[in-house]
Amino acid sequence: MIKLYELVDFLNRYLDIDKFEEIDPIVNGLEIEGEYTVSKVATCVSITNNIIDEAIRGGINVLITHHGIITRRNGVKRIVGSFKEKLRKILMNNISVLAYHLPLDAHVEIGNNVSIAKVLNLNIIDWIYEKNIPIGVVALCNDKASIYDVYKEVKSKINEKAILLKYGLDRVERIAIISGAGAKFIKKFTKREVDLFMTGEFREDCEVYAIDEKINVIVMGHYASEVFGVRNLARLLREKFNIETVFLRSEQII
């Protein structure tokens, strides 16, 4: 069996968490220390009370989440209500909690953005940077595709409830992809640079920009755009350490 801190050390190095220190609101790495020996690992996008209950029923003692429960910006001011219940169940059941946020969006092998491009059979040609850190990708269709065909693929392979904002060309070639809450990054582009911008959730001011710049937008859904990294992580750990892993799906819609 692998020890907890062996797992933490491997993931911290593999996902290169130190370089995201300045820009990530989430505390990456080990957030809550549980048992020292890893018996069964679950991955998830966010930790709800239902996810914790499922982990307890499944004998999970390490929970790896994309959205951690400890943030730099907000901090923990009060431990009350549903948050208190979360912590109580985690601590009483000696579950370790690890979080990997931007490192798992950006990773060049198992990250959310790379995975979305692969699922849609797109060729990555460039990276989208924030403070010299790659947080998204620009990808190319082999042939200029109908925007409606791309949208159909997204609905089929990522989220049937994805939304198309058709403000640009009927046929698209260059596609920018940023999973999660990446709306603001559309303002890095003009219609001459990308034909389609894809992200997890969108904002009104960014929609105005898309209209004025005539850039198509597909809103994939925040949750749906971020299941890939944690799923890939579960598979990686299973293959590398021969430990039992499972992906826990949430009832989240947005």
Where in the sequence are the language-model features?
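Active-site catalytic microenvironments in core metabolic enzymes, especially phosphate/sugar-handling
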Residues: 1-254
